[in-house]
Curated annotation (Swiss-Prot):
PANTHER family: DIMETHYLANILINE MONOOXYGENASE
Name of the protein in its database record: Flavin-containing monooxygenase ustF2
Disrupted-gene phenotype: Impairs the production of ustiloxin B but accumulates intermediates such as ustiloxin F and C.
Provenance organism: Aspergillus flavus (strain ATCC 200026 / FGSC A1120 / IAM 13836 / NRRL 3357 / JCM 12722 / SRRC 167)
A Pfam family assignment: NAD_binding_8
Keywords: FAD, Flavoprotein, Glycoprotein, Monooxygenase, NADP, Oxidoreductase, Signal
Pathway: Mycotoxin biosynthesis
Amino acid sequence: MANPQTTRVAVVGAGISGVLAAGHLLATGLEVTVFERNAAPGGVWYAIPFSGLLATREADAWARLYDERTPIEPSYPAMKPSKADPPATNEQETSRFMLQHAPPGPCYYNLQNNVPTPLLEVSLKPWPDGTPDTVRHDVIQRFIQDMSIEAKVHDVTRYEARVKKVVKDGAEWKITWSTPQVGLQSETSEFEQVSPFDVVIVASGHYHAPRVPDIPGLSDTKRKYGSRILHSKEYRRPENFRNKNILMIGGGVSSIDIANDISPFANTIYQSTRNSKFDLVESMLPENGVRVHEISHFEIQSHSDEPLSDDEPLPLTIHFESGQNLHGIHMIMLCTGYHITFPYLEEYHSDETTLQDADENILITDGTQVHNLYQDIFYIPDPTLVFVGLPYYTFTFSIFDFQAIVVAQVLSGTVQLPTETEMRSEYNAKVERVGLGKVFHSILGTEENYVHDLLTWVNTSRAAQELVAIKGFSPRWYEAKEALRQKYRAQVNK
């Protein structure tokens, strides 16, 4: 298949996937513009803008190196994926406007990487010598921001630029984007612009739109007791859970990490799971953590409108599918993940279509996967729409780096895309092999195979042009993966 005719490339997002994509593209000589709705790079690791971060690097102000604000609360249950990013209203109160224009991410006070730094290696920048396996969020943010500066991505990034709409108009893409404008009376509005591009790379991540399950009674409980129920994206500090009994819904990474973070302050932490294949083992919970069954429904026991005192538990019975129930809970935290959503690509969403009924043009149905991509990267009907950063349950930085390398090789003309028929055949084979939904973008345990397939394709073209082959994972990466595997095995056998 003929490669996209590429001169102008837009990258949506300046988290790790966007910085990697833009950096590799710039290295090939392409014209790149990055749109980032925050004031600096970093994505989920974003804390404070460049000026503040650079000014405090030698100071002891690390305690404020994250966004203390909490995002606007999600709907209970969650909105449809295509509506997961409601538009800001012009001339509204500034702080709320900015919460919508550039919502705070899930970064919290004690957030650290849960994958060792050697497994987060990228080709654009090595980790500094002596970097520990585990570091605070501000260290990772600094790493991404330094990479952005060194790779010249910072120079081509439009900050505080929210992408509102991306549409194909003939042979080019039109991106509608806005920046905030503060008026004389401190009211905030948007200045909107439209810019044309040949290729759009979606690198906006999938930790934006909270997935709130439709458990019977949960919406009523939230409506009545408000701040006692929150999504993990809203979590900031463990001290807020002092002497409380906490119910956490979900058994994945965020649930385990936050449970361990609040453990020194909380009384008992109950973790409700559905025994998903992606749940982490119970032994990873802290000593005051207890795993319980899947929730059947919530039952409010009091209809009084009197506010609860801070140390008073919710007048609530939590019923489990096992027939058991639970009382005495002070707070409920939903660690239930996120919708995959691209609200600026609304015409490619089809909220009412089932996974199985998605046609060959739809990108998003129920928010659990992106349809119709070749190698989780190229939109098969139109490869001028590209995605970097979709795989999960993996070692994100390294995988996204290889994706970005492939994109740069294709868009620069070094590597040819397969025909549309060949890409469609590969996609259909993957659907048959792994299934639809959440599992589709998981490459848990198969990272090496995924990267091998990408590099076999790329290096075949490079060899034909007598170009040096692109190398895969380093020996250090393999050593770190084996060490992590042994550590997890020991945890399972506890």
